[in-house]
Amino acid sequence: MSRYRGPRMKIIRRLGSLPGLTNKVLRSKPGYTDQLISNKKVSQYRIRLEEKQKLRFHYGLTERQLLKYVRIARKAKGSTGNVLLQLLEMRLDNVIFRLGMSSTIPGARQLVNHRHIMINDEMVDTPGYNCKPRDIITLKNISESRSGIPKGIDSSQRSRTPNHLVFDSSRGVGFVNQIIDREWISLKINELLVVEYYSRQA
C-alpha cells in the first residue's frame, strides 16, 4: 500500500487529531460524532485497525514500512509497543517536525527530500534516517532553507518540544539528547492494540 496523498481532513474526521498529518482543526457538526458511535457496534478488530491507521497516517508511512518497524521492534529488548513508538519518533522527518522546523511531518519530509537538512555536517536526504543521541541537525544554506519553515510556528510548536530534543532558533540547529520517553510522545495512541493487530503478520 502506497503512502496516502488524499484529503487530510477526511482522515482526521475518521481517526481524530493527527498532529503529524495536519495542524488543521476539524469542526464537526453538533451530535454528528455521537450519532455515528451510537449507530455502530464497533468490533475489536476495527478498534485495532483504527489504532494502526492512526500510527500510519500520523507518521506518514506505507503499510510495508510500518510492518517493517513492527518486526524490528519485536526483535528488540523491552516492550514491543514502546520500542515501536521510539523507532518512529526517532525518524528524521518526525524529529524535524518535533523540533518545530516544520508544521507537519509531510512538510518535514519535503525539507529532507529537497536536501535542506544536514546531520553532523553531512547532507541527509532520507526521511526515515534513524536519529541518534548526540546528532546535530542543521538547515543547509540556512538563509534559503528558513523560507521553507512556516512563520509563527516557533511559539506554538517549539514550546512543546519534547525533553529529548533541543532547538537553537538563533542558529537553526537542533540537538538530539537521548531516545524519547513514552510520556513525551504527542500522539494519543494505544500502541498495544497496534502490536495485537500485527500479531499474525510480524
Curated annotation (Swiss-Prot):
Entries under SMART domains matching the protein: Ribosomal_S4, S4
Primary location group: plastid
Gene3D superfamilies: Ribosomal Protein S4 Delta 41, Chain A, domain 1 (1.10.1050.10), RNA-binding S4 domain (3.10.290.10)
NCBIfam families: PRK05327.1, rpsD_bact
One MF annotation (Gene Ontology) recorded for this entry: rRNA binding
Domain S4 RNA-binding intervals: 90-148
A GO cellular-component term linked to this record: chloroplast
Gene from which the chain derives: rps4
Entries under PANTHER family matching the protein: 30S 40S RIBOSOMAL PROTEIN, SMALL RIBOSOMAL SUBUNIT PROTEIN US4M
GO biological process: ribosomal small subunit biogenesis; translation
Protein name: Small ribosomal subunit protein uS4c
Family: Belongs to the universal ribosomal protein uS4 family.
InterPro entries reported for this sequence: Ribosomal_uS4 (IPR022801), Ribosomal_uS4_bac-type (IPR005709), Ribosomal_uS4_CS (IPR018079), Ribosomal_uS4_N (IPR001912), S4_RNA-bd (IPR002942), S4_RNA-bd_sf (IPR036986)
Entry keyword set: Chloroplast, Plastid, Ribonucleoprotein, Ribosomal protein, RNA-binding, rRNA-binding
